């Protein structure tokens, strides 16, 4: 039977056309898709009523399988079955081999050193594999909602760097999806929780998924979601629990080496044991011909060191946010790994309150993303919710002496644009090198280099006369672009920062630890470098002045006095005493004051020559 569209005469049958939008939680272990229907956000299920899609792709010789069918192939066809591909996104093959030496895949490197998985269907890179997962989720959404998606919001860990975010967007484009926004996973959870409860105040979002851990401290007030601070580990999650259990079982069985099939069988047994121990005190195991029990106490002993790492990140995030644990009103639990009773107990003890688990921890991120997608698609024009994310590490620029000038401090809300003016160091300088760095330390050598580019075409001027405006802009997805503009000519250079691969697992945490551990040494090193730069400026300026006017304006004795002052300052500059260099600069300035006055008089006389008093 044909359906008739009925509307008032002269009025569209859909005066306020609802655009189809979805939120996608592209997870390490599992992925989900959700959408707002009839004003309520909910996850979309497959034909068997399952909301979760395992983040697994099998490239068999006969077909490509995604989700549950792919996971079934993991044990029998490990080389062609890719699990936890999210851990490979935006990383180099060298980094992957160092961090995950036991992966069963056959890797080779691309020309840029990025990983390629060799499968029965040919070479596949992490972006292509992720795209296949996104396609499966998009097909589910299209079938459920009855039309093509106008756009999606995809969630990423808060600690994903530029390369990992770009790779996620590239995967979405390959899947034919229009990305409305990338959204930090803890922030998505805050959206879902905040709208459901109407709570106001400081909230901690503890997100322990399959492959990543994030802690976010947020303030919810009158519809405004502000991330006060973030922390975490981009490679710590439930997968690590599984591997610890598998290693324990391997020792129990007495196996010294494993085939890929045996390794996968152990991982599967470990995962099932972890799930069983969520409800029971013991788990019965039958794997590789070995039968035995695994207790909740054994599990807790194994995972305690990893949980301690997450709580250290929580303590650091609270310090960054400037709040105490007792100021946190609620703790939101996100990620399937938070179902483990020991995790909930430890987090509850740390914050001094029972964590909230009323929203399904597997679904909360996708639901929050769906709510945000609905707003960005224009379906809620009156929505008052304002979302503010932050950058996890400071972004800066190298200045003379190897110093770092921070342009955007860490935990600044994004999107954001900040600019500073810089100038030339040498007379006649016509180009400037811009070195973009990331980190909390005072010296360039202690920070992470992101990119370099040059601004050419600066008009030749005296040192310090040119004005170069350097602008750092971070968009809503956390991607950075840097622009350098010479103000008098309009000459401009720009670069988008897209590193070839991301930070190693412990680099972010280590960078923050180092910034605190070496704070005093860094400030002393910075003070020394600053005095050396100033000494170089004074020396170069005075040498240039002597070459230009020394013979004309100074006696030989005066000239020798200044040369001795320069030599003394050079000697001090090459030393390690910042205070001595500072005093040497003052002494040199004092010794050259009379010479500077004579040069000024000469310049004035030259400017007035040939002009009458009336003209002046």
Swiss-Prot record:
GO terms for biological process: iron-sulfur cluster assembly. GO terms for molecular function: ATP binding; ATP hydrolysis activity; ATP-dependent protein folding chaperone; unfolded protein binding. Gene3D superfamilies: 1.20.1270.10, 3.30.420.40, Actin, Chain A, domain 4, Substrate Binding Domain Of DNAk, Chain A, domain 1. It holds the Pfam family HSP70. Disulfide bonds: none annotated. Keywords: ATP-binding, Chaperone, Nucleotide-binding. The keyword Nucleotide-binding applies. Chaperone involved in the maturation of iron-sulfur cluster-containing proteins. Has a low intrinsic ATPase activity which is markedly stimulated by HscB. HAMAP family: HscA. Belongs to the heat shock protein 70 family. This is Chaperone protein HscA homolog. The gene is hscA.
């Amino acid at each position: 039977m044909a359906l008739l569209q009925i509307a008032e005469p002269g009025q569209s049958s859909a005066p306020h056309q609802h655009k189809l939008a979805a939120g996608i939680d592209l997870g390490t272990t599992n992925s989900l898709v959700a959408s707002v229907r009839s004003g309520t956000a909910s996850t979309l299920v497959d034909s068997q009523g399952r909301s979760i899609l395992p983040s697994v792709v099998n490239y068999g010789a006969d077909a490509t399988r995604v989700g549950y069918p792919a996971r079934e192939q993991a044990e029998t066809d490990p080389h062609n079955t890719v699990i936890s591909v999210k851990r490979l996104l935006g990383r180099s093959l060298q980094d992957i081999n160092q961090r995950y030496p036991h992966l069963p895949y056959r890797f080779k490197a691309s020309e840029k050193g990025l990983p390629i998985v060799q499968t029965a269907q040919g070479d596949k890179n992490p972006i292509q594999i992720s795209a296949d997962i996104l396609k499966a989720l998009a097909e589910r959404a299209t079938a459920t909602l009855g039309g093509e998606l106008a756009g999606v919001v995809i969630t990423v860990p808060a600690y994903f760097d530029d390369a990992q975010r770009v790779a996620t967007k590239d995967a979405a484009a390959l899947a034919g999806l229009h990305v409305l926004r990338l959204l930090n996973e803890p922030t998505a959870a805050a959206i879902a929780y905040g709208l459901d409860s109407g709570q106001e105040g400081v909230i901690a979002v503890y997100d322990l998924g399959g492959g990543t851990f994030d802690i976010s401290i947020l303030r919810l007030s009158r519809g405004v979601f502000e991330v006060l601070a973030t922390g975490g580990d981009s490679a710590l999650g439930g997968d690590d629990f599984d591997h610890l259990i598998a290693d324990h079982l391997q020792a129990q069985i007495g196996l010294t080496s494993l085939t890929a099939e045996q390794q996968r069988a152990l991982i599967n047994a470990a995962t099932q044991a972890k799930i069983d121990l969520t409800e029971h005190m013991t788990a019965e195991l039958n794997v590789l011909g070995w039968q035995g029990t695994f207790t909740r106490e054994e599990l807790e002993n194994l995972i305690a060191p990893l949980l301690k790492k997450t709580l250290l990140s929580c303590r650091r995030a609270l310090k960054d946010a400037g709040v105490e644990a007792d100021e946190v009103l609620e703790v939101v639990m996100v990620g399937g790994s938070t179902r483990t009773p020991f995790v909930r107990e430890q987090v509850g003890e740390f914050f001094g309150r029972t964590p909230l688990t009323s929203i399904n921890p597997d679904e909360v991120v996708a639901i929050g993303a769906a709510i945000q997608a609905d707003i960005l698609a224009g379906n809620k024009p009156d929505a008052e919710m304002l979302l503010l994310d932050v950058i996890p590490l400071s972004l800066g620029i190298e200045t003379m002496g190897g110093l770092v000038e921070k342009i955007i401090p860490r935990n600044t809300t994004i999107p954001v644009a900040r600019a500073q003016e810089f100038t030339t160091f040498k007379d006649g300088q016509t180009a400037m090198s811009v070195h973009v760095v990331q980190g909390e330390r005072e010296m360039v050598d202690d920070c992470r280099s992101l990119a370099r580019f040059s601004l050419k075409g600066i008009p030749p001027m005296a040192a310090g006369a040119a004005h170069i405006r350097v602008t750092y802009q971070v968009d809503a997805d956390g991607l950075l672009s840097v622009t350098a503009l010479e103000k008098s000519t309009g000459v401009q250079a720009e670069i988008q920062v897209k590193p070839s691969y991301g930070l190693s697992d412990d680099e972010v945490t280590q960078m923050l630890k180092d910034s605190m551990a070496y704070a005093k040494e860094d400030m002393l090193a910075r003070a020394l470098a600053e005095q050396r730069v100033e000494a170089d400026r004074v020396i170069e300026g005075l040498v240039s002045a002597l070459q230009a006017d020394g013979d004309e304006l100074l006696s030989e004795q005066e000239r020798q006095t200044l040369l001795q002052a320069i030599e003394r300052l050079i000697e001090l500059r090459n030393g390690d005493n910042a205070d001595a260099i500072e005093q040497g600069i003052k002494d040199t300035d004092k010794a050259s004051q009379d010479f500077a006055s004579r040069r000024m008089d000469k310049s004035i006389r030259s400017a007035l020559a040939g002009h009458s008093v009336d003209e002046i």
